[in-house]
Amino acid sequence: MNKYQNAAHLSGRFVSEFGMEAYPHLETTKRMIQPVEQQHPGSAMMDFRNKAGDHERRLSTYVAENLPLRSFDLATFTHLAQTVQSETMRYAYKAWRRMWGETGRRKCGGALVWQLNDCWPTISWAVVDYYLVKKPAFYAIARALRSLDVGIARSDPDWTNGHNDPTLADPADFEVWISSSRLESVEARLAVSFISIATGRHVRDPIIRTVEARPNATTECVDGQRAAEIDKDDLGWGKDDPYVIHAVLEVNGKTEATDTAWPQPLKYLDFSSRGVSVEYSSCKTEVRVSAKLPVKGFVFSETQGLELSDNGFDIMPGEVHVVHIGGSGVAKAGLSWTYVGAERTEVAASRPKL
């Protein structure tokens, strides 16, 4: 098995099939798995609903290698599996779209994800389940395929070779680029920030540039830079202060795209006390999500008929992520949500706070 972080090295002129398995949302699982006693990872009925060969070994390996597995209950494992699938889509689509390059230097011309949706209620590679409920990976693909997108590639240590020291600092070599499918050049403002996961502070000065995104091409913006090592003597057991690299692309003062590169693996990071806030508008047609500290993989648990404008996203301090809500499945008592490292699945208050 290959790490999904290595997607950029697994490309071709056309990627005809690739994917990653994930559980559907909880509502779908509970509809297809009966009796209730079978609703847990590894049960006979759960295995029956997964037709992939060696699925136990493959899915569990990807989760255990990358994410903090503090509980094996259905809700927690569902979120972690969905996060793995979503991260795979982010790494793959952004890397391969970058390889579209420019005229005369095209390296990758397209990719087909396996698969779009299911033909029966199951656990599979689909990014939309049998009841047309979208998994977080669907939104990761949508974000990566925006007409104007920004991407970050960050160096990753090999933490599975048995001879690594997880307390050492990540040197964080990184690159930033813009992918455009528009037919005209676009002048944009690019801001790259370096944010401490532990404190939310900016650990070095941001990179701010005005760039011209070329039409139907990739525009390389930051190439081969290395972020400085940040001392962490007063913050805990490690020898550095882990931080995210966060890029924001604006056109005429409006945010067109963002991307965030985290230190790998995510399971070594402390996600406690994120200070997440979820607030409904007065008419409950939108919800605003914010956090005091960087958050990974914020996911609303979706149900049949519910329509969200976005899901499965990261949150940075100082930003407000607005999600529009619609459809026949709008939850009247509040949407259930969680994120990587959350102590428990939390429920947003239904009373408006705006």
Identify the function of each model-found stretch:
Residues 177-178, 220-274, 324-354:
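Terminal connector regions
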Residues 169-212, 220-221, 243-249, 290, ...:
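Beta-strand-rich binding/interaction modules
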Residues 1-186:
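Substrate-binding clefts and catalytic carboxylate motifs of secreted carbohydrate-active enzymes
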Residues 144-152, 160, 255-283:
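Long, low-complexity ectodomains and other extracytoplasmic segments of secretory-pathway proteins
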Residues 272-326, 340-342:
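C-terminal accessory/binding modules appended to enzymatic or scaffolding proteins
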Residues 109-115, 299, 335-339:
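Conserved active-site loop/cleft motifs that coordinate metal ions or position small ligands
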Residues 190-240, 305-331:
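Intrinsically disordered, low-complexity Pro/Gly/Ser/Thr-rich segments with frequent PxxP/GP/PP motifs
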Residues 123-124, 128, 206-209, 259:
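Short hydrophobic alpha-helix segments
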